[in-house]
């Protein structure tokens, strides 16, 4: 499983011109699911995203400006967007190979479980719409982007 996370000032997802999810400051996370992923790897990924320290600590003078706080500690939102293209192999040729991505039906079920778990761990969770043609708007803060992986 892979997640591309971005620290954002705000982000939203719309489908067919209708907003389906939005957050103010926090983390926009694109989630890619692979063949071997399961509920345990989904839970590990959510835990990693929620505890990954990508926000400055402006409270402690000794840590001023250091990336020392996570999204929960700054009361930020979490916007989860499914993104099978993160599982692409790009090492050969000039066309991505999506063979490493989980089949759509299984991925939809696992992504729903990932969302459900995230909502038990964090107050402010929004999502895109699985399998839809989504328009994602965000204002990156930094910008700070990280590619996270869990087995």
UniProtKB/Swiss-Prot annotation:
Entry keyword set: Cytoplasm, Hydrolase, RNA-binding, tRNA-binding
Catalytic reaction list: glycyl-tRNA(Ala) + H2O = tRNA(Ala) + glycine + H(+); a D-aminoacyl-tRNA + H2O = a tRNA + a D-alpha-amino acid + H(+)
EC code: 3.1.1.96
Gene Ontology process terms (BP): D-amino acid catabolic process
Enzyme class: hydrolase
Motif (Gly-cisPro motif, important for rejection of L-amino acids): 142-143
Gene Ontology MF term list: D-tyrosyl-tRNA(Tyr) deacylase activity; Gly-tRNA(Ala) deacylase activity; Ser(Gly)-tRNA(Ala) hydrolase activity; tRNA binding
GO cellular component, one term: cytoplasm
InterPro entries listed in its UniProt record: Daa-tRNA_deacyls_DTD, DTD-like_sf
Subcellular location: Cytoplasm
PANTHER family on file: D-AMINOACYL-TRNA DEACYLASE 1 (PTHR10472:SF5), D-TYROSYL-TRNA TYR DEACYLASE (PTHR10472)
Oligomeric form and interacting partners: Homodimer.
Similarity field: Belongs to the DTD family.
NCBIfam families: D-aminoacyl-tRNA deacylase
HAMAP family: Deacylase_Dtd
Chain's role: An aminoacyl-tRNA editing enzyme that deacylates mischarged D-aminoacyl-tRNAs. Also deacylates mischarged glycyl-tRNA(Ala), protecting cells against glycine mischarging by AlaRS. Acts via tRNA-based rather than protein-based catalysis; rejects L-amino acids rather than detecting D-amino acids in the active site. By recycling D-aminoacyl-tRNA to D-amino acids and free tRNA molecules, this enzyme counteracts the toxicity associated with the formation of D-aminoacyl-tRNA entities in vivo and helps enforce protein L-homochirality.
Protein name in UniProt: D-aminoacyl-tRNA deacylase
Species this protein is from: Psychrobacter arcticus (strain DSM 17307 / VKM B-2377 / 273-4)
Encoding gene, per UniProt annotation: dtd
């Amino acid at each position: 499983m892979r997640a591309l996370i971005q620290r954002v000032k705000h982000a939203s997802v719309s489908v067919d011109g209708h907003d389906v999810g939005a957050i103010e400051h926090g983390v926009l996370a694109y989630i890619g699911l692979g063949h071997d992923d399961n509920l345990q790897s989904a839970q590990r990924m959510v835990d990693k995203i929620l505890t990954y320290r990508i926000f400055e600590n402006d409270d402690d003078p000794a840590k001023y400006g250091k990336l020392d706080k996570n999204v929960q500690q700054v009361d930020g939102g979490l916007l989860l967007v499914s993104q099978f293209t993160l599982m692409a192999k790009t090492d050969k040729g000039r066309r991505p190979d999506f063979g490493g991505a989980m089949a759509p039906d299984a991925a939809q079920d696992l992504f729903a479980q990932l969302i459900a778990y995230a909502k038990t761990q964090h107050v402010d969770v929004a999502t895109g719409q699985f399998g839809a043609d989504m328009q994602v708007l965000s204002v990156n803060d930094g910008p700070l982007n990280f590619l996270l992986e869990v087995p």
